Each structure stands twice: as structure tokens, then as C-alpha cells.
Amino acid sequence: MVVLMDMNTNEYDIRLSRGHVLIDGGEGLLLVDTGSPMSFHELGRIRLCGGEYSVPESLPGAGADYVSGKVGERVAGLVGMDILGPLGARIDIPGGKLILQPSTEGTAPVPSGVSGLGYVFADMTVAGRPARVILDTGAPVSYISPSFTEGLVPVDHVTDFNPMVPGDTFETPVFEIPSSFAGRDFQMRAGHLPGFFTGMLSMLGVDGVVGMEIFGRMPVVLADGEVRA
């Protein structure tokens, strides 16, 4: 349920912590996570852009204490696509701003869509091949199907976390892969998700999960069920 309030702020300063996108929601820091279909807050509500949204106090395996420990800042909640999708959002990490209910002026649509589960899909090119990925601001490390890295030599190894993984952490090699999104070419650094995650993505017709490798390079607008850049 949404209760209208006398709050008209739709622009928020972004701060990064360990590659995670945080904003001050007025009742504690919020992790901005387009890869999460659901939001939560330890107070059971999130107040943004003139509205109050009733949300659970935690998600399975992930509450405020868990997220705080992973991102390195005291976080009160997470704002996901159940709020960001209907509002629309311009996520401008290079400019340091999150704008809700944004204008789409000066942007062009990217082949994309939002699934019934709340995930944001977009098309890009990886290693000269078309790839459909989930756009996830909650992913400091990006991931791509191993089929896109065949023959490549890792340039790094990293440890990442996910509450669905036994022990909640996993290691992955990282590769540099020629990629393109919204007409912009770049070298994407991406690893491999644990096998069962790759299988789940394959069932959704998805080749990977991309976060800061795109969001850190350009403003991205989510509006009216599409992605624009």
C-alpha cells in the first residue's frame, strides 16, 4: 500500500561502498538494488519520492544486519524493483545521483524488458555475440555464462557473496571481454556464477548479470517497463 506524504524529493545523492549503490532514505541508508524484485526496511516502511511504501522488515536470508556487514556501511534497508519499477529511476553513478520519476529526454530505448518476477533484462553484445543480461545495481562484480569466456585467460580472481550460496561466499575467475551496450564499446570484467545460478539464468533465457560494468560507465534510465541510456 502507498500512503501519500508531504515529501517531494525525487533526487538523491549516491554514495558507493564496496561497489554498492547507497542513498539516504531519511530513515537510514538504503541499498539500491535493481537485481532484487523486493524491498525491505527494518522499520517495515520506505519513504521515497512523496510516498510511504509498506515493505517487509527483512528478506529470506538477508536483513539489515546481513547487508550492512557485506556493504561496509550501516544499512537500514534495500529498495528493489517493486518500488523502483513503478516509480521509474535514472541511475547516474558517474554523476552521483538517483532521480526517481525521471524524464527520458535525451535517452534512447535499449532492447529490454521487465519480467513478471521483477527482473530487468537488457540486450548487449559480449565477445561479438548477442547476450541478454539482468541489469543489477546490486552487483559490484558482473557475471556472464562460461560459453562467452571460452579460450580466455583470467585476469583476476575475486570472492563475492550471495545468501543463497552455502556459506554465503564463493570465488570466481574474472575475465576481460570486449562488450557493447547502448552503442558504447568497452572491456567488461566478468566472472562466472556458481553452476546452479547459471542453470537458473539459462532457464530464464539469460546469459549473465551485469552491474557496475554498465552502471558505472553511463546513466541508465528505467521507465515505463523499458531501459533507456
Where are these regions (language model features)?
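Pepsin/retropepsin-fold aspartyl endopeptidases
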Residues: 1-229
